[in-house]
């Protein structure tokens, strides 16, 4: 189990960093044509897929246990899923609706800034 007290600061940083990065990405597109989909994914979907790819991990159970005890960062899976589930643009990009595995009710989503 994750230690929320240990990872709280980094979880907040991941959330804020993702919001800022997404806004910077949108700002970079202003005045430009919308890029064509690649492999069936829109530019905004590719932004979120890139974020998810950044934190991909393949680690052994004993390393998971070790990191959970000492690392102030959540494991990659949770850095991705927890951050994405809390921001509205992710829902819009992938048309996520109630009943989908990544859905979280708007009232339950973290809003810090």
Go through each PLM region and give its residues:
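Zinc-dependent metallohydrolase catalytic domains
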Residues: 1-113
């Amino acid at each position: 189990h994750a230690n929320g007290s240990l990872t709280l600061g980094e979880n907040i940083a991941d959330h804020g960093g993702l919001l800022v990065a997404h806004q910077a990405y949108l700002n970079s597109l202003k005045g430009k044509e919308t890029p064509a989909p690649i492999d069936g994914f829109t530019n905004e979907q590719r932004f979120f897929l890139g974020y998810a790819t950044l934190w991909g991990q393949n680690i052994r159970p004993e390393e998971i246990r070790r990191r959970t005890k000492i690392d102030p960062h959540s494991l990659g899976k949770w850095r991705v899923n927890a951050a994405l589930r809390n921001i509205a643009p992710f829902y819009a990009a992938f048309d996520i609706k109630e009943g989908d595995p990544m859905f979280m009710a708007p009232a339950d989503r973290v809003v810090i800034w």
